Design a protein with these regions (language model features):
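Conserved PLP-binding active-site segment in aminotransferase class I/II-type PLP enzymes
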Residues: 1-62, 83, 108, 255, ...
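PLP-dependent aminotransferase class I/II
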Residues: 27-32, 36-43, 115-118, 127, ...
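PLP-dependent aminotransferase-like
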Residues: 57-153
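A short alpha/beta connector and helix-capping loop motif
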Residues: 98-104, 156-166, 383, 387-393
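Structural preference for beta-strand elements that scaffold enzyme active sites
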Residues: 141-143, 165, 371-373
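Conserved active-site segment immediately N-terminal to the catalytic lysine
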Residues: 144-178, 193
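Short beta-strand-to-turn element immediately C-terminal to the catalytic PLP-Schiff-base lysine
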Residues: 168-169, 183-188, 219
Length: 398
């Protein structure tokens, strides 16, 4: 079966798991990550959401409203709440999947502490529109959510540099991975020092248990997502037997992982250091895969293709269809797993429905209902394209 995702890891990463934990690996990873993102400083965290919560603390933002997209990963508002602030949700633009910045500007009040644009699925935020907002509100911190996008660019401008800081995720579904983990980057030296100070009293060192768990987790995940094996794994996943490993949110709860305050370990950093050398090749391959899909699926009825931007990094290739469940079922019958990441509109979730930042976001609701993610790791592309041509044309003619 063709899995919906597969981390780009090889022998260098697996060999890193067999080496003794090396003191200084985390700072080395931070320096390498900052250089890759063309920023002055980077700070590693156990999760991107932990980094966001600590960043808001370092900025002195508390008891404020934080503007964020309604259609994004739910861990973002979770981190906002854990930081002592309140998320205010803004609808999305169907044409580029990202937060409607004009609508976001209308939400700015005296209580607004920051705004978090997200380059969802690797599609860059419209930096021209954002520049106008920043000019009209020069004191408002902009935090770029680059968990999906990393170094995506808008008209040649790197998104991650257009704000006070940027937040990245590093689990195995991301463009590059440190098994688990997150990173915050900035060009502001004073903020970097304060962020590290906050981390010092908020985050405990990684335990030996965490280090060993990560040594085992990465090869296990790589094997589970190996196509000849994945059919059996997918059966267990659909039965709910793997929920503790694959389900990252609870519809009714605002929570964080149990180890959200246990720092990144040296084993994770060692894997991350090796991943940095792969980044350019990973992005080149994903752009090639996206171009393949864009060409092969063009003109098919009942499918809306994602927006095309030259600077996109394509963490996901996300189409829109009206009959998503039928498409997913038919694909599974053909040995293809399609994804539906961000299958929720956050304000509609029970955990947020009655909070002060609730807003009705119809576009986000529609996108959450229609979005389908195609496998981007590069395997089975011809089979996937053939499936779409045969299935969509057949459905359209009946």
């Amino acid at each position: 079966m063709i899995p919906r995702l597969r981390p780009c890891i090889g022998w260098p990463e697996l060999l890193a798991l067999c080496m003794p934990a090396r003191k200084g690996a985390v700072p080395e990873f931070e320096r390498g990550f900052a250089a890759l993102m063309e920023q002055g400083y980077a700070a590693a965290f156990p999760y991107g959401r932990t980094g966001l919560a600590c960043l808001l603390e370092a900025l002195g933002i508390r008891d404020k409203e934080i503007i964020c997209p309604a259609w994004t990963c739910v861990v973002v508002p979770h981190a906002i709440v854990y930081s002592g602030n309140e998320p205010v949700f803004v609808d999305s633009r169907p044409e580029d999947y990202n937060m409607d910045l004009e609508a976001a500007e209308r939400e700015i009040t005296a209580r607004t502490g920051a705004i978090i644009p997200t380059s969802l699925f690797g599609h860059p935020v419209d930096l021209d529109c954002l520049a106008g907002l920043r000019a009209r509100h020069p004191g408002l911190p902009v935090i770029q959510d680059c968990a999906h996008s990393f170094a995506a660019s808008w008209n040649g401008k790197p998104v991650q540099k257009e704000g006070i800081a940027a937040v990245f995720g590093l689990n195995i579904s991301k463009l590059i991975t440190s098994i688990f983990g997150g990173m915050v980057t900035t060009d502001d030296a004073a903020l970097a020092r304060e962020l590290c100070r906050v981390r010092e009293y908020t985050i405990s060192p990684a335990s030996w248990r965490k280090e060993w768990k990560n040594r085992l987790y990465l090869p296990a995940a790589a094997m589970a997502l190996y196509p000849p094996v994945y059919g059996a794994i997918n059966t267990l996943e659909r039965m709910g037997s793997l929920n503790r490993f694959v389900k990252y949110y609870d519809e009714v709860a605002i929570d964080m992982p149990k180890d959200w305050q246990e720092g990144m370990g040296a084993v994770q950093a060692a894997v991350g250091i090796r991943q940095l050398t792969r980044y350019a090749d990973i992005i080149t391959r994903r752009r090639g895969t996206a171009a393949f899909y864009h060409k092969q699926l063009a003109g098919l009825p009942d499918i809306k293709l994602p927006p095309w931007a030259e600077g996109a990094t394509w963490s996901h290739y996300t189409i829109r269809v009206k009959k998503r469940e039928e498409l997913l079922r038919q694909a599974l019958r053909q040995g293809i797993q399609l994804g539906w990441l961000v299958e929720y509109n956050i304000p509609d979730m029970a955990a947020y429905r009655n909070r002060p930042g609730f807003r009705d976001c119809p576009a986000a609701r529609m996108l959450a209902r229609e979005a389908v993610n195609l496998p981007m790791w590069g395997g089975g592309l011809l089979k996937i394209a053939d499936f779409f041509r045969s299935h969509i044309v057949y459905q359209h003619s009946n």
